[in-house]
Amino acid sequence: MRLPLLVSAGVLLVALLPCPPCRALLSRGPVLGARQAPQHPQALDFLQPQQQPQQPQPRPVLLRMGEEYFLRLGNLNKSPAAPLSPASSPLTGSSGNRPDEVAANFFRALLQQLPLPRRPLDSPSGPAERGAENALSSRQEAPERERRSEEPPISLDLTFHLLREVLEMARAEQLAQQAHSNRKLMEIIGK
């Protein structure tokens, strides 16, 4: 009787005690990627309303596989480490950008992240060599195009069928993991 009471009291104490503030939340450096020591750390209190900072900082828009990809909504030719200007960020709530401009910049940034088509290693890489290659290969591509047009394209039904199969397999695996964890939990509680 005492042991479960002590364990539950300990869990409640750990859950309700204020945690030390996170360094990532405290640092408000001008560059997001740079690790800097906080100049004037403040303890974060989640029960009181947060004050709005005077100068809004840009935030990451996409997170993929633990890496941050920043959508540079201003000049997309800048280096990837260049910070967003506060006027160009849609998260700051500025009314300077029209929604269609923001959407156009968003899609342009997404297109930049798409992988480029790959070419064989033995193909020439210079623009003049590519022009000569295009002139020579245009004659060779005609039979290849005819062959490609004769092959039936992969139907969308097949694509969606394969997608459904993969999703069903993932769902079955998730249910198996859940059943395993439930069995372990029942063994622990039953003892």
Swiss-Prot record:
Q: Which residues carry this modification: Isoleucine amide?
A: 189
GO terms for biological process, alphabetical: adrenal gland development; female pregnancy; glucocorticoid biosynthetic process; inflammatory response; locomotory exploration behavior; lung development; negative regulation of epinephrine secretion; negative regulation of glucagon secretion
InterPro entries listed in its UniProt record: Corticotropin-releasing_fac_CS (IPR018446), CRF (IPR000187), Urocortin_CRF (IPR003620)
Q: Does the keyword NADP apply?
A: no
Residue span(s) of the pro-peptide: 25-148
Q: Where is this region: Disordered?
A: 115-153
Q: Where in the cell is it found?
A: Secreted
Basic and acidic residues bias: start-end ranges = 141-151
Q: Where is it mostly found?
A: secreted
PROSITE patterns reported in the protein's UniProt record: CRF
CC per GO annotation? extracellular space; neuronal cell body; synapse
Its keywords, alphabetically, are: Amidation, Cleavage on pair of basic residues, Hormone, Secreted, Signal
The record's account of tissue expression is: Produced by the hypothalamus.
GO molecular function terms here? corticotropin-releasing hormone activity
Signal sequence bounds: 1-24
**Quaternary arrangement and interactors, per the entry?**
Interacts (via C-terminus) with CRFR1 (via N-terminal extracellular domain).
Q: Which family does it belong to?
A: Belongs to the sauvagine/corticotropin-releasing factor/urotensin I family.
Its job:
Hormone regulating the release of corticotropin from pituitary gland. Induces NLRP6 in intestinal epithelial cells, hence may influence gut microbiota profile.
Please give the name of this protein: Corticoliberin
Q: Which organism is it from?
A: Sus scrofa
